[in-house]
Amino acid sequence: MGRPRHYSEQEFEALVSSALDELPIEFQRALEHVAIVVSDRGAENHAYGMYVGSKLGGSPFFGGGGSPDEIMIFRDTLVRDFGDDPNRLRAHVVQTVRHEVGHYLGFDEAGVNKLGL
């Protein structure tokens, strides 16, 4: 495994945007009021992504309630672990986006893993 290359904020946001564009249209519509945020706080959260808010039609998930729903995709940890190979990085960004969308749709960790997300 080589050294991860630097990905600018714009380059990484383009990967996230592409992953969102690949979602089924019904999922894209469901996300209209969810903020999608690229962050470099993955190392402190020990994660590639995080959903904060209320599950669709449900109760707060991971401290939500009152704040707008937000999906965070962590550039620092994804680039650190997969940035040496653009194809692997892209695949893991797609997987992370889908995983966090699964949480928004109401699935817990076991549920998204069972779905292969």
Predicted regions: what is each one?
Residues 92-100:
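Short alpha-helical catalytic segment bearing the HExxH-like zincin motif
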Residues 1-92, 104, 111-113:
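Active-site rim/adjacent substrate-binding subdomains
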